[in-house]
A protein has these predicted regions:
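Short glycine-rich phosphate-binding loop at a beta-alpha junction
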Residues: 64-73, 238-249, 270-273
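A contiguous, well-structured pocket-lining segment that forms one wall/lid of small-molecule binding clefts
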Residues: 27, 173-242, 251-265, 270, ...
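N-terminal beta-alpha supersecondary unit
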Residues: 2-64, 70-74, 103
C-alpha cells in the first residue's frame, strides 16, 4: 500500500509518498516566508499553499497512491482547508479513500519510525507546540507542556522584534555561538513551562545588549527548562528512550543538551533528522498508513480541527 500525505497546517505546504513498510518514496515541500519582522499572515499563507499545491503534489506522485492522508489539525484554519480540499480533489480523481490525521501525532510517529524505538518519551518542539509526551493507555499522553506559547513561536517572536528573517531559529542558533550568558526568567512548574516572561524580558533588552548574548541566553535558558521537564517525565514514566522531534528539533544545542541528559541517565537518544523534523508530507503519509482502517470515500465528511490536541486521538494501531 502507498499513501500520499498532504501537510498544510501553517507555513509549509508539503507532500510525501510512503509505503506500508515505512519506505519514504518522496518528500516535497514549499514554505511561505513572510518579510523580516512579520509573522505568518494566515490569508497569505493560504494563498501561497493554493499557488504551489498542484506543483508540489505532482512532484511527489512518482507512483499512484492507494490512499491519501491530510493533516486535519491542529493548525491555522485557512491553511488546513487548502490541504483538506486538495486531498479530497485528488482522492476523487484517483477514486481512493481519504483519512484525516493529527499533525502532532504525525511528528511523533515519524520519529518512532526513524528511531526504531519501542516506548520512548518524546520532546515535541515546534512553532505552536511544546509538549513532553509518552504513550499510556491507548493514547499519547501529554505529561508536560507550555502554558502559554510554543518554543518555536518564542524564537520567531524574538526574531521579529530583532529583525531576524523568518524562520528565526537557524540564525538565532548561529548568533548564539558567539554569545555570553545574561540571566533571564526561568519558569518551570512541575512538568510545565512558560515562555512569555522570557519573551517580554528579551524584547526590552534588544538594543541594550549584544544580539549574540541575547540569542545565547535565550537558548540556554529555554533549552535547560525543556531538558529539566523532559528528564522529570522520563523518571515519572520509567522510560529510557527519548526522541526529539518537531521543527525546533533541528537545533544542535538543544539536541546536545538532551543527549547529555540521556547519557547521564543511561538512556537512548534520537534526534529526528532535519528533513523530517520540521513540517513535511512524509510524516502525514506514514500516519495515514498507520491509521488506514479509518480511511473512507465519504469525502463530504472530511473535516478539520484547528484545536485538535495530541491527547484527544485514540491510537488504533501499534507502531
Amino acid at each position: 500500500m502507498i499513501c500520499l500525505g498532504i501537510e498544510s497546517t501553517a507555513h509549509t505546504f508539503g507532500t510525501g509518498l510512503v509505503d506500508s513498510k515505512g519506505n519514504i518514496l518522496a518528500n516535497v515541500k514549499d514554505m511561505y516566508r513572510p518579510p523580516a519582522g512579520w509573522g505568518i499572515d494566515p490569508s497569505k499563507a493560504k494563498q501561497h499553499h493554493i499557488d504551489v499545491a498542484d506543483k508540489i503534489i505532482s512532484e511527489a506522485l512518482i507512483e499512484k497512491p492507494d490512499m491519501i492522508a491530510y493533516a486535519a489539525g491542529p493548525g491555522l484554519p485557512p491553511c488546513l482547508k487548502v490541504g483538506r480540499d486538495k486531498a479530497v480533489e485528488y482522492a476523487k480523481k484517483f477514486n481512493i479513500p481519504i483519512v484525516p490525521v493529527n499533525h502532532c501525532i504525525a511528528h511523533l510517529e515519524i520519529g518512532k519510525l526513524l528511531a526504531k524505538f519501542k516506548d520512548p518519551v518524546m520532546l515535541y518542539v515546534s512553532g505552536g507546540n511544546t509538549q513532553v509526551i509518552a504513550f499510556e493507555a491507548e493514547r499519547y499522553r501529554v505529561f508536560g507542556e507550555t502554558e502559554d506559547i510554543g518554543i518555536g513561536n518564542l524564537l520567531d517572536a524574538f526574531g521579529r522584534a530583532a529583525k531576524i528573517d523568518f524562520p528565526a531559529g537557524p540564525e538565532i542558533e548561529e548568533l548564539a555561538k558567539k554569545g555570553k550568558y545574561i540571566e533571564l526568567p526561568y519558569s518551570v512548574k512541575g512538568m510545565d513551562v512558560t515562555f512569555s516572561g522570557i519573551k517580554t524580558k528579551l524584547e526590552k533588552m534588544i538594543g541594550k545588549f549584544p544580539i549574540e548574548d541575547l540569542c545565547y541566553s535565550l537558548q540556554e535558558t529555554c533549552f535547560a527548562m525543556l531538558v529539566e521537564v523532559t528528564e522529570r517525565a522520563m523518571a515519572h514514566c520509567q522510560k529510557n528512550e527519548l526522541i526529539l522531534t518537531g521543527g525546533v528539533a533541528a537545533n544542535k544545542r538543544l539536541a546536545e543538551m538532551c543527549a547529555i541528559m540521556c547519557k547521564e541517565r543511561g538512556a537512548k537518544f534520537f534526534q529526528v533528522p532535519i528533513q523530517y523534523a520540521g513540517d513535511q508530507g512524509a510524516m502525514i503519509a506514514w500516519n495515514g498508513i498507520l491509521s488506514k482502517e479509518l480511511a473512507t470515500k465519504k469525502y463530504d465528511k472530511s473535516e478539520i480541527n484547528s484545536k485538535w490536541r495530541t491527547d484527544e486521538v485514540d491510537i488504533t494501531w501499534k507502531s
